Amino acid sequence: MLKLVIGLMLVAGQVSGPGGALPQVLHPDFKSASPVKAGKRAEVIISFTAIKGYVVDRELPFTLKLTEVPGVTLEKTEIAASGKDPKAKDNYYVDLPTLKVGITAAKAGKYEVPGKLKYFFCNKADGFCSTQTLDVKIPVQAE
């Protein structure tokens, strides 16, 4: 029984990596294509940067699931990135995708649209790969 417990602890330690948690591999950046005007459709563009030494798989799902908030209407609540990357020679992005979110704010004000970003990444140094889900909040400033 003791050997089983020790074995499980070793496996759990290897899966979680040093420090016990995976690093946040992608960092989103949110920009609106134009000023967000109340009552008018606008587009928020989400671009990403990856931390050095990690790559993101372009053949596995890269999705953003959003939750509507009062005062903001979303064109879509689920957005998937295209796996196309002309520079890629394998199944990893060279140029990370951008996601476009169509929104309409009912009235002027500040809003935050929550969502979950899900993607698959690999560490180039040791070959460790995993799915990661991030909580994101899209800031919206409507005039």
Can you name each region flagged by the protein language model?
Residues 15-143:
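Extracellular/lumen-exposed scaffold segments
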Residues 3-13:
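Sec-dependent N-terminal signal peptides
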